[in-house]
Amino acid sequence: MAIWQGRSLKKPSGGRIVLARKKRKRELGREPSNTRVAEQDKRKIIRTYGGNRKVRLTAAAYANVFDKSGKGRKVRIIRVLENPANRQFARRNIITKGAIIETEIGKAKVTSRPGQDGVVNAILLEE
């Protein structure tokens, strides 16, 4: 079943709102990509509104980690340590923006949105 991102059909009192129009295609949503830690990167290209394209990262093996000086390195992701979006995501190794990941060079905080950008960018945390 499709995900609809239009206004709710219920009033705060619980009464029903009758729409003056049909649902529009632009109001459709999609399931979250739930980017997982894996052995290999896996991407999906999706057609979006206006014929544009969005790259979804469904499985991630590497992250671009930047230090305080701005120097970046491509390093392997080992696991997700914690995720403020949902504490179950850390247990399931799901990467979202703000997640703390363990990499080869230490802990890093994810700054990109892997399900929207198609890449994992992170900043190295001071120990």
Curated annotation (Swiss-Prot):
List GO molecular-function terms, semicolon-separated.
structural constituent of ribosome
> What CDD domains does this protein map onto?
Ribosomal_S8e
UniProt key word Ribonucleoprotein: yes
- Annotated Gene Ontology cellular component terms: ribonucleoprotein complex; ribosome
Pfam families given in the database record: Ribosomal_S8e
Q: InterPro entries, from UniProt?
A: Ribosomal_eS8, Ribosomal_eS8_CS, Ribosomal_protein_eS8_arc, Ribosomal_Se8/biogenesis_NSA2
Q: How does it assemble?
A: Part of the 30S ribosomal subunit.
| Name assigned to this protein | Small ribosomal subunit protein eS8
The organism's lineage is: Archaea, Methanobacteriati, Methanobacteriota, Thermococci, Thermococcales
